[in-house]
Design a protein with these regions (language model features):
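Reductase modules of NAD(P)H-dependent flavoproteins
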Residues: 106, 110-116, 123, 228-229, ...
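Membrane-embedded alpha-helical bundles that constitute the cytochrome b-like, heme-associated redox core
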Residues: 1-174, 179, 326
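Histidine-anchored nucleotide/phosphate-binding helix
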Residues: 271-285
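Ferredoxin-reductase
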Residues: 153-243, 259, 282, 288, ...
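Conserved beta-strand elements of the Class I
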Residues: 261-265
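A short, basic/flexible loop-to-alpha-helix module at the beginning of a structural domain
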Residues: 247-258
Length: 340
């Protein structure tokens, strides 16, 4: 669990270790369930050994069953199972999901204290005990920075909203101007956005991909309005202060600079990072061959189709662009893309 917390700490110094925050998040999604499974295995084997020694099931699994019941350990175990399950509940709103993750860190610290203090292999073998303490301190520091300190100490840039452009199909563009220093970023990265004046959500950070080129002064985020926070964005007025944290992510065209041929597939709002890459190709003199497939349900969902055709195809690089409406052409598969 400590490593899982380190993966999503949002510290620029740790991004290269995991290949960018986007890859770190995918790794985090593997580590989280793995930690829960290992916790269950640990408890099962421990319970079997205790049952053979004459301990009752109530003392092992029911808090406050008797004076000998390890109530605090039992409560922490159930809390970790509950929070671990809720973390993967897709029906939960983003705000509640975020709160669950914050609480998980506190429960982790309680479990970590149990692991270090409780008599057993860790306490008896000093090198293992030292390693566990290092992991716990690293995980605890990651949680503290991520939950408590990031809003103040994170890589924040102040922007003012210039305009909100409605693209249709519940998609908008937020175009903003820097207040003082401009954020430097690579095409394809993403940021966390906060609106300090949004009542009830002043402290919330939401991730969005950048769809503008780093050579432009304006910063553009392309957003699908599907949640409580995003549905309030179209009503923001010009001049509203926006806090932008970033940039994050390793999915950039610079990462694949040695490759002369690129195949890019963007589905729905997933076309966003490729818009920034295409915009950058206008000023990039390094020739490469690019195949871009814009996958949508039908043509009316392709809100960036005209922008791609009118603005990005006339570059130094050769861009072969294909709109792929699945309602007429079916799912986009590798064989179909290569033969079209």
């Amino acid at each position: 669990m400590a490593i899982a917390m380190l993966t999503v700490v949002r510290a620029h110094a740790l991004q290269p270790v995991f290949g960018g925050l986007d890859r770190a998040v995918r790794f985090h999604r593997i580590l989280g369930p793995s930690a829960i499974v290992l916790l269950i295995v640990h408890v099962v084997f421990l319970a079997l050994a205790q049952l053979e020694g004459g301990t009752s099931i109530g003392d092992l699994f029911i808090p406050f069953w008797s004076e000998s019941a390890r109530s605090m350990d039992i409560i922490i175990f159930y809390l970790l199972l509950l929070l671990g399950g809720l973390a993967y509940d897709r029906r939960m709103s983003y705000e509640r999901w975020l709160s669950v993750h914050r609480l998980t860190g506190l429960v982790f610290l309680g479990g970590a204290a149990h692991a270090v203090i409780e008599p057993g292999t860790i306490a008896d073998f000093e090198p293992l005990r030292t390693w566990m303490v290092i992991l716990i301190l690293a995980g605890g520091a990651a949680w503290l920075y991520r939950v408590v300190l990031f809003n103040r100490l994170g890589p924040r840039y102040l922007y003012l909203l210039k305009t909100v452009v409605s693209r249709g199909n519940n998609i908008i563009d937020l175009v903003m101007l820097p207040v003082d220093r401009r954020m430097m970023y690579e095409p394809g990265t993403f940021v966390f956005l906060r609106v300090p004046d949004m009542e009830g959500q002043q402290k919330e950070l939401h991730p969005f991909s950048i769809s503008s080129s780093p050579v432009e002064r304006d910063l553009r985020l392309s957003i699908r309005t599907v949640g409580g926070f995003t549905r309030r964005l179209p009503s923001l007025e010009a001049g509203t202060q926006l806090d932008v944290y970033g940039p994050f992510g390793g999915f950039t065209s610079h990462r694949y600079a040695p490759f002369r041929r690129l195949v890019c597939i963007g589905a729905g709002i997933g076309i966003t990072p490729f818009l920034g890459m295409l915009a950058f190709e206008i000023s990039n003199r390094d020739f490469r061959r690019i195949w871009l497939y814009y996958v949508v349900r039908d043509e009316k969902d392709a809100v960036y189709d005209s922008e791609i055709r009118e603005s990005y195809l006339d570059t130094e690089s050769y861009i072969d662009y294909e709109l792929w409406p699945t309602a007429h052409r079916g799912c986009a598969r590798c064989a179909g893309c290569l033969t079209c």
